[in-house]
Every structure is written in C-alpha cells, then in structure tokens.
Amino acid sequence: MSNKLVLVLNCGSSSLKFAIIDALTGDDQISGLAECFGLEDSRIKWKVDGNKFESKLGAFTAHREAVEFIVKEILGQYPDVAAQIQAIGHRVVHGGEKFTHSVVIDDSVIAGIEDCAALAPLHNPAHLIGIRAAQASFPGLPQVAVFDTAFHQTMPERAFVYALPYKLYREHGIRRYGMHGTSHLFVSREAAKALGKELADTNVICAHLGNGASVTAVKGGKSVDTSMGLTPLEGLVMGTRCGDIDPSIIYHLVDRLGYTLDEVNNLMNKQSGLLGISELTNDCRGIEEGYAEGHKGATLALEIFCYRLAKYIASYTVPLGRLDALVFTGGIGENSDLIREKVLNLLAIFNFEVDPARNQAARFGNQGQITTDNGPVAMVIPTNEEWVIAEDAVSLLK
C-alpha cells in the first residue's frame, strides 16, 4: 500500500464528503458522505473495498461530529490506513484573487477564506467549519486548501472584467471568478494525455455538467475563459440555477411583482434551471425520462439546456483559436449520451460527427472518444477532483 495517502474533505452547508486518496494513483481507500446535518436523521455512509456501510450520527449533529466519527469509528477499524495519512486536503469553493494556487493552511489562510465568504456565503463558512473540525481531530497533520477559483486566475482582464464601472472591480473585487477549476484542471490535463500531446500545446473546451455546470476554455493548460462568474449562478442552465438572464428581470420581479431580493435570489438559485422550466425535476435523469415520454416541460428544459451549452462551447473557440478536443465531464457529461449527441449535433458547423457506439460506451466511468475519426474530437473524461486535491497536498509537503 502507498504511503502517500491524503484525507480529502469537501464540506457543504449540510453535508461532508470525504475520501482517503492515494496521491500517486488516485485510488480511494475509503470514501463516504455524511449528510442531513442539523436534522434528527443526521447520518454517515461510507465504502471500503466495494463494501458499503451506514450509521446514524445522532440527532442535530454536524461537521465536528462527522469528522470525529471518521477518525474514531471508521479509521479506528483500519489503523494501517490511518497511519499512512500524510495530510488533510480541503476543497474550498472561493479564494477570490487572494489565492492563485493551493496553500498550506495557517491563520492567515483561514482569515483569507473568511474574507472571501461574502463571495460564497453558502460554501466558505462550511469549509471553515470543516477545517477547524479537522484541525481538532488531526492536530499533528498539515492541512491544505485547494481552491475551485484558483485555476481561473490565469484569465485575462478582457475575460473576467464586467462592463460595469471599473471601480467596482478595483475597490470591491466584483469580477468573473469561475468555479469547478479543480475539475477543469484535471480533465484538461487528462485530455492532453489522451491526445498524445504536450499540455502546453493542447487547446480544449471542458464542459463540467452536473447539478451545477460550467464550460471552460483551456489554452496550453491555462484557463482563458469560463462561464460561471462572480458566483456559480452565471452561465449555463443548471439543475436549479437559471444561468444567464437579463439582469433587469430582477428589478421587474421586485418592482412589478412584489418579490423581495432574498426571494429573487432563492428563485434564481433554487427554483429555476431544469426544475423551473420543466416544472418536474432538477435531476437530469428525470428530465430525460420525461423527454422520452413526451413531457412538454421536460422536452423544453432539455432543449434549452443543450442549446445554451452549445452556444457557450461555440463561443469559446474564439479565445482558443484552435480546438484540439471538446471534453465532457461531471455526472451529466459522463453519463448522458443523449445530451452529448444533441449538443454535438447543434455544433454541426464544426463538423463534429457522433459515433453512436463510442458514445454509448463512454458512460458509467468509462473514458473515451465519442466522435468518429473523420472530424474534430469530442471525448468523455470522468473527473477526479479528489485526486488533484491529494496531489496538491502531497506536493506542498515536499
């Protein structure tokens, strides 16, 4: 067994994902999810060597109790694994302009994450709770923060500055930051390997499609544009997020329809997207089932989702100049051959030609090209953000 193990923590507001990752191979030794924090049925599920386990955490428990359970109840059963953990790696959604790469956590880093909390009010406070819980449970291990926004810090000003008064950026940091950076980094790197090219000479467009979704143009291994903005709300149609809309709709909802700003924020983040259009579900699998059954709302939601995505992909050929591959990843990108086919058909101007057999095969964790050899390459690469976090954690300890 490797001695390069890292405990990776991804703390949400009401959940905590964890995995013990071999930084050399990307294999997980143990992985799991603690969820329903603050509720009576707070629980934890985990998997070891394909075997699944579940336990109650106790009513109204949260991050600290979950980390303590991982240490005492799970790792306590696998002391050989626990002894080889070299670091704790934390996913942090927003690092603003302060953090352009992964860092070892100290008091100044914690203060910086707190400063960025206004840009990610649902995520950064939860990450801080997880960091403090991990520090209490693993006082002797270094803690590393890996930021979703860091990969996008290579974008030029023309891509990240909004057409608002410049002082709003200069004085308040209002700009495009982007998300899913760790995923876009991983799949763009893997795409270069699959193409047999040097990363510095590889131009790809990465579509990370899940309940949250974003597209990134990656030129020579660096992000040059991305669809999410100041927050994850901008860009594509998502599970419950609206993505791009006319900003004046906000004022129409408030002034004409009597919404409060909090209600508008909730509407755009939690009631829109696939759920709002379909009036059925935010789950893409349910949308596809509805589409197959002729459900009008599901059909419209699917068409808008694919159309918006194809438009973004087409526009991102502009900063690249040359496209070596289009890469699909994330839960939807890795598993929905229907959506991939629809998007590629909408991109007919680029001469993508779907290979039905390849497209069917590239699902459920299988990587591969999904187009014929007669035109541009589109491929599926399953993401592995935890591996990137583990690699960064180990590299920072050298």
UniProtKB/Swiss-Prot annotation:
Keyword Cytoplasm: yes
Classification lineage: Bacteria, Pseudomonadati, Pseudomonadota, Gammaproteobacteria, Alteromonadales
Binding-site residues for ATP, renumbered to this chain: 17, 208-212, 283-285, 331-335
Organism in which the protein naturally occurs: Shewanella loihica (strain ATCC BAA-1088 / PV-4)
Domain of life of the organism encoding this protein: Bacteria
Oligomeric and partner information: Homodimer.
One Pfam family it belongs to: Acetate_kinase
InterPro entries: Ac/propionate_kinase, Aliphatic_acid_kin_short-chain, Aliphatic_acid_kinase_CS, ATPase_NBD
Broad class of the protein's primary localization: cytoplasm
Protein's job: Catalyzes the formation of acetyl phosphate from acetate and ATP. Can also catalyze the reverse reaction.
Name listed for the protein in its UniProt record: Acetate kinase
UniProt xrefs under SUPFAM superfamilies: Actin-like ATPase domain
Gene: ackA
BP GO terms, sorted: acetate metabolic process; acetyl-CoA biosynthetic process
